[in-house]
Amino acid sequence: MPPMPFYRRPDRRLRPLTPRSPAPAAPPSAAGPADPGDVGYAVVDLETTGLSPATDSIIEIGLVLLDPDGSTQRSWTTLVNPGADVDAGPTSIHGLVGEDLADAPTLGRVADLLVRDLAGRAVVAHNARFDVGFLTQALGGLGRLGRGARIPRVCTMELARSYMTTPSRRLVACCEAAGVRIGSHHCALDDANASAGLLRHYMSVGRERGDESVAWSRSLEAAAAFSAWSWDGAAARTQESGLVPRDGAGVPRAPREPRMRAS
């Protein structure tokens, strides 16, 4: 989700990042999700060097996999080396600096794992347009997503208009209203877990209303039919051991933002 500045940490000296070897140019082969029964939702949060998928880079991934009922199956997180001598972007937001990323894998070295766990699932994010935009740009460039493909998605920020009464749609405000724990804001895994909690809250409200035919249910059908992913299963298993989680928490609390009018 897009950054919202409010936190400043002491400046730390950056050391140049060492570019890693690029990912293979040819798309790997895949015959479907690693586990054909492993379907549901992939709740993702990305921390980035900026706001533009075309010019900025992913520097942290948090992923929480849910079954169709919203129960957590597994999760993982890693820092990502952007692969060039650049800084980490808005340190005051995500709390990361260049030296934090130096020993992390490049996106190409976790792409097969990421795509394997996204495949067959509806991608969920708070402000999905932002996170899915970065995934589309980055994974498409690595040959892991078909050109022009539209990833099936669920946006917990957009759904807040129908399932929340709070006037603000920012993640922290929605979590407070729903009683969902958020942990350290702008730490990718904590934010992904918070978005997963919001999805479960919306599901609960939907059941109470007797409304089962809603956006997140329909998205499962779209995800099952989506065939534009491409990955190497053996590489994905190897990449599981190369993840580098952040050392320490993210930003402890959220900024105050302009209020948004509810629909």
PLM features: residue spans?
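Conserved non-catalytic scaffold segment of RNase H-like nuclease domains
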Residues: 2-152, 164-186
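Acidic two-metal-ion nuclease catalytic site recognized across multiple nuclease folds
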Residues: 2-33, 198-263
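Acidic, Mg2+-coordinating catalytic module of metal-dependent nucleases/exonucleases
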Residues: 122-139, 169-239
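A generic structural signal for short hydrophobic patches within well-formed alpha-helices
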Residues: 159-160
